[in-house]
Amino acid sequence: MNETLKEELLQSIREVKDYPKKGILFKDITTLLNYPKLFNKLIDALKKRYLALNIDFIVGIEARGFILGSALAYALGVGFVPVRKKGKLPAHTLSQSYSLEYGSDSIEIHSDAFRGIKGVRVVLIDDLLATGGTALASLELIKALQAECIEACFLMGLKELPGIQLLEERVKTFCLLEC
């Protein structure tokens, strides 16, 4: 990815102090999405990265991973699979719990998400990699469905949190922007 694109993306992402709670600097990508030419450049750059890798599906983590993942799946001509919070998918699901700062949560994937095909090649995508909990749980769901995650892709990775390192121990990890 070229440095000009990275700089344009960084400048387009709004930072909101103390959201959703005090001490957090929230990275809001809705401002990036308001610029169609820049969003297209982002998706085109990701398409170029994955086009030759024979990807079968893009797996997007709720909610902003849906935006990036759907656009990328369309650009690549492959299927899109959502990973959602527990209780949000209508058919039979597999569930995976993960730890939060205070407690735990669960995410789910449809048990037929890859149409019953074993060994499909997928890219996992989300907007932000922080602690890595949701991404690691998503990898477990992908593995449970006997798919191969080729890479976990994030628009941003927070260097001061352990997510990048934890994920790199399990799967090739790409963060377009390290913040």
UniProtKB/Swiss-Prot annotation:
Major enzyme class:
transferase
Q: Which reaction does it catalyse?
A: AMP + diphosphate = 5-phospho-alpha-D-ribose 1-diphosphate + adenine
For whether the record's keyword set contains Glycosyltransferase, the answer is yes
Output a single Gene Ontology CC term carried by this record: cytoplasm
Q: Which domain of life is it from?
A: Bacteria
Coiled-coil residues are none
Q: Name one GO molecular function term.
A: adenine binding
Keywords noted in UniProt: Cytoplasm, Glycosyltransferase, Purine salvage, Transferase
Q: Where is this protein found? A: Cytoplasm
Q: What is its main location?
A: cytoplasm
Assigned EC number: 2.4.2.7
Keyword Cytoplasm attached: yes
Annotated CDD domains: PRTases_typeI (cd06223)
Annotated pathway:
Purine metabolism; AMP biosynthesis via salvage pathway; AMP from adenine: step 1/1
Q: Name one Pfam family in it.
A: Pribosyltran
Which SUPFAM superfamilies does UniProt cross-reference here? PRTase-like
GO BP term, example: AMP salvage
The UniProt family comment states: Belongs to the purine/pyrimidine phosphoribosyltransferase family.
Q: How does it assemble?
A: Homodimer.
Q: Which PANTHER family match?
A: ADENINE PHOSPHORIBOSYLTRANSFERASE (PTHR32315:SF3)
Q: What does this protein do?
A: Catalyzes a salvage reaction resulting in the formation of AMP, that is energically less costly than de novo synthesis.
* Protein name stated in the entry: Adenine phosphoribosyltransferase
The source organism is Helicobacter pylori (strain G27)
- Gene field: apt
